[in-house]
Amino acid sequence: MENVFDYEDIQLIPAKCVVNSRSECDTSVTLGNRTFKLPVVPANMQTIIDEKIAKYLAEKNYFYIMHRFEPEKRIDFIQDMQEYNLFTSISVGVKEEEYTFIEDLAAKQLIPDYITIDIAHGHSDAVIKMIKHIKNNLPSSFVIAGNVGTPEAVRELENAGADATKVGIGPGKVCITKIKTGFGTGGWQLAALRWCAKAASKPIIADGGIRTHGDIAKSIRFGASMVMIGSLFAGHEESPGETIEQDGKKIKEYFGSASEFQKGEKKNVEGKKMYVEHKGPLQDTLTEMEQDLQSSISYAGGKQLDAIRNVDYVVVKNSIFNGDKVF
């Protein structure tokens, strides 16, 4: 591997602006048969998304992926969303009971629009087998498979039938895979994304390591169709999880998907818990992301998201922030 870099090492280079106002720039993106307002999806984690937020996002035309940590609620969730005439997007694992679950959905003719196979190490026989099982039983569902970190993995999952792959092994803020195992894309997630995107023939979802809104534009530049974000979506008014007051400040809990807090036991722990500052309404963050991305498109010299894919960039090793803080 040469040219290894991460988000903070990269600066995109502006091109001549062709709009009078950033509001002319269109941030929408198509995934499967649908077009969404932003190329961003909140992480399918228990402290980030719940049924209420999923419904809100779908109504407002944002992409969502419901988490898989209360498997018994999934059928009701699909039925509810369909009753509201909203798109359905769920997660599954690879255990035996998930095979039965997929067969149940087919038998009941409950067909999710999107199914994400969500395991920490997605380059595995188990995931390939599950992709094929879903495609046999629910051929019209759009299958996202992950998580992976290599071009070989992307090719194998695409060849097995995945409609998109999710790239990122342990770069997330509450993920400690890199520390516990020695493996992962933490510290070079953006380079891994670029490497994987070059091999991909289908969409890629970049997952993890996003710390600023500018990182969304950088992900698009290096090949992502959609960007999954955890920590920036944590701690909102609507977010699941407790709000507590500490030193006169409101904070909320945020924990990783393989943490003991999510599992309820201390076994194979690869996630941790942290508290994040209370961020106010979710819509404020979504609106700010859209405006920042519109600005990114205007700096890229275009009117559509794709303009960002063609800009030049420089590698500035770990120096672009010079201690800058947005707040």
From Swiss-Prot:
Role this protein plays: Catalyzes the irreversible NADPH-dependent deamination of GMP to IMP. It functions in the conversion of nucleobase, nucleoside and nucleotide derivatives of G to A nucleotides, and in maintaining the intracellular balance of A and G nucleotides.
Identification of the protein by name: GMP reductase
Organism in which the protein naturally occurs: Oceanobacillus iheyensis (strain DSM 14371 / CIP 107618 / JCM 11309 / KCTC 3954 / HTE831)
Reactions the enzyme catalyzes: IMP + NH4(+) + NADP(+) = GMP + NADPH + 2 H(+)
A Gene Ontology biological process term: purine nucleotide metabolic process
Gene Ontology MF terms: GMP reductase activity
Alphabetized PANTHER family for the sequence: GMP REDUCTASE (PTHR43170:SF5)
SUPFAM superfamilies: Inosine monophosphate dehydrogenase (IMPDH)
Pfam families assigned to the protein according to its UniProt record, in alphabetical order: IMPDH
Binding sites annotated in the UniProt record for NADP(+): 204-227
Superkingdom as given in the UniProt entry: Bacteria
Keywords: NADP, Oxidoreductase
GO cellular component: cytosol; GMP reductase complex
Stated family: Belongs to the IMPDH/GMPR family. GuaC type 2 subfamily.
